[in-house]
Amino acid sequence: MHVITKKRLIEFAAEYPTARDPLLKWYVVVSKTDFAPFSALRSAFGSVDQVGKFTVFDIGGNKYRLIAAIHFNRRRVYIRHVLTHAEYDKGKWKEK
């Protein structure tokens, strides 16, 4: 899959250093694998859910959330948000 954009992962990891390794691990797995359909994602990442039009990944032992729009037919993963669990729970990301 082609991940757009890795820059968001790097910026988030700069602010939250403990997120760096789990985010990079996520990036490597996703960028080197073709996932289709959603059930393939669930097999690779047990903690992934569909929330509306977005796919939400639990990252770093449930400390962080990565929210992406995935276009399986185009092999594209668009990172929309990377949040702490507390930021995710506030739900403001749904408004954007």
Over which residues does each language-model region extend?
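Basic, Lys/Arg-enriched alpha-helical interface segments
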Residues: 1-63, 71-78, 86-96
